[in-house]
A protein has these predicted regions:
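Acidic, Ser/Thr/Pro-rich intrinsically disordered cytosolic tails and loops
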Residues: 1-194
Length: 194
């Protein structure tokens, strides 16, 4: 679906965080604490991504991330042999559309948040992801994804005083929808700029 590289990298990061393979220790510059042992079921590009973030030298990290991307593209090119590119794109567009429809159709903030968490990678494929996320979560409370504490270093340790309650890993805390949408979109933009 030819998305910008920064969006692809963010999708990989979120997938890794959802699987519990790492947590963000700082956002700028992005630093990860990698789980040991790694959880089962990671894709090769995910383990390559994590290996790149174990490198402390910025040039070495960039080189390792570049190699990961080249390897991922080669792998996808090989897997696409014999398939119609047009039909494949239409298929993934329909999955993305269905994912958004399920989020939008949810009747309660809890269900909407749960559906969004489940469909995050598919919704991120949307070129209008930023605006659509803001529109959908503009009003009402939103429950952070259960893995969000791995992405937002301040989220897990927020102790009173603010509008975001302290979070326990795996628990869900509610925030105003606009705040959540801004947090997701800004997190993606910040990661993309690193």
């Amino acid at each position: 679906m030819e998305r910008p590289l920064d969006k692809v990298m963010t999708m990989i990061l979120f997938g890794i965080l959802k699987k519990g393979a790492a947590r963000v220790t700082t956002r700028e510059p992005l630093a990860l604490e990698i789980t040991d042992p790694l959880p089962e079921g990671l894709y090769a590009y995910e383990t390559d991504f994590l290996a790149a973030f174990q490198k402390t030298d910025k040039v070495e990290r960039q080189k390792a991330l570049s190699e990961m991307v080249v390897s991922l593209i080669k792998s996808l090119t090989e897997k696409m042999k014999g398939f119609s590119r047009k039909e494949t794109l239409e298929y993934y567009q329909s999955i993305m559309k269905t994912a958004w429809e399920q989020v939008e159709a949810a009747n309660t903030p809890e269900v909407k948040s749960e559906r969004y968490e489940q469909a995050l990678e598919w919704t991120m494929l949307d070129k209008d992801y930023d605006d659509r996320t803001r529109d959908i979560f503009r009003t009402g409370p939103v429950f952070y994804p259960t893995w969000w504490w791995r992405f937002d270093p301040g989220h897990a340790s927020a102790a009173g005083g603010g509008s975001i309650p302290a979070a326990i890993p795996g628990s869900r805390s509610a925030v105003p929808g606009a705040d959540f949408a801004a947090s997701v979109v800004n997190g993606i933009q910040n990661f993309s700029s690193n």
